[in-house]
């Protein structure tokens, strides 16, 4: 086991604080409408220019192991806030730094860390309650535009995100992809889309666009491989008699079966398109079941004791239209029973709540969106790749912020909500004594910090701005972009309640952990051994 280095009390806390400050000072320059960018070196490719707190925090590793621990504690604040609320990471970092700074001053002056921690917790509970009381419900597209614009620092992005949210509703999924052009555009996909295209190009109905469009088709859904035409011949005969079209979704269609379908299509006997089933393994079964419920059909599977040769037309799904492209299939207006679709949506929502894996959650959200609201794709365009990546991060933040706003509502932005919570905190402080009171005072001081930082990033004196907002009526804050004092709700400067609440809770949690630290243990770096001397030349 490697030897360890240990630091105690004041020395340990100071080392942690240096790390906290190095990370927080790097992150906080990005706060507010006049916040600057940070350039991150990349091992491969061009450097990344970002304005996103958590992305910067994740890149920071310090050489000194003790300082690095302090930095990692605050990094945890940023990433936890990002996981829960998706935005507000810089605010959380600024709050944590302020609480740690004030707390360490008081501990150095003789305060008891454990009692300070109790005071901090009581104060945060009061602040969170106050933030919830201030919260207003999101009303309509305009509020969403405000939230997205503030989060991304760009009105165009705000409008785009609001359009996307309006089209796909809360259960829909909005994905962000890189565009081939310099334009940033929004594409709405109606109905259920999955990433599998036609098995054979001979199946297309529109040769110019290279896509197959089937109006009012039957849909055969199976998890089997179809190799011989005998398997589906009885079914095909019934469909030809009715003069209908057919979409086959199967594990694969190959050999003689595929050849027969293509020949019949070319002769005009039967218009049929075959696509492979989406997903893999258990996820494929679930997705096929989703398609079956959406179209009112049944998954023909041996597990259910169903045989392809005995399939009746009543077991097939129906849809108003199916569009099959080279790599995508879109089912529009499935004929499924609305109550069954609703039940399926509820079941997926429950799975989303219970899953612990981020990957599974993302896939479940996609399935939910396809069943419920549809899918919107924002194609991000920019002149250079560096700018595109930066823009993509900002759009992702804006999306997370709008979802958080729809969930829990909005509060005045620009650090105003924290300042407006101070009077409620003052009432609590009057009831506390000793170090508990000091703990609550630490939180009170920290609440001013986001606004002070926004003002300083705009090149103004933070303390003057903070005092002016404190003296103003509730809801009046500082518009740093236009350098004026306004009613934040009216000016459209708002933050999601969830983001504001999460930022203060996570910051306090990390600060409390760090302030109650008495010893720090790190691994001693091994000294590099000198290489052996080269052997003398032999003659």
Swiss-Prot record:
Pfam families: Cpn60_TCP1. It comes from the Bacteria. It catalyses: ATP + H2O + a folded polypeptide = ADP + phosphate + an unfolded polypeptide. The keyword Kinase does not apply. Its EC number is 5.6.1.7. Its main location: cytoplasm. CDD domains: GroEL. ATP binds at residues 30-33, 87-91, 414, 479-481, 495. Keywords: ATP-binding, Chaperone, Cytoplasm, Isomerase, Nucleotide-binding. Coiled coil: none annotated. It is found in: Cytoplasm. One of its GO terms (molecular function) is isomerase activity. InterPro entries: Chaperonin_Cpn60_CS (IPR018370), Cpn60/GroEL (IPR001844), Cpn60/GroEL/TCP-1 (IPR002423), GroEL-like_apical_dom_sf (IPR027409), GROEL-like_equatorial_sf (IPR027413), TCP-1-like_intermed_sf (IPR027410). Together with its co-chaperonin GroES, plays an essential role in assisting protein folding. The GroEL-GroES system forms a nano-cage that allows encapsulation of the non-native substrate proteins and provides a physical environment optimized to promote and accelerate protein folding. Forms a cylinder of 14 subunits composed of two heptameric rings stacked back-to-back. Interacts with the co-chaperonin GroES. This is Chaperonin GroEL. It comes from Caldicellulosiruptor saccharolyticus (strain ATCC 43494 / DSM 8903 / Tp8T 6331). The gene is groEL.
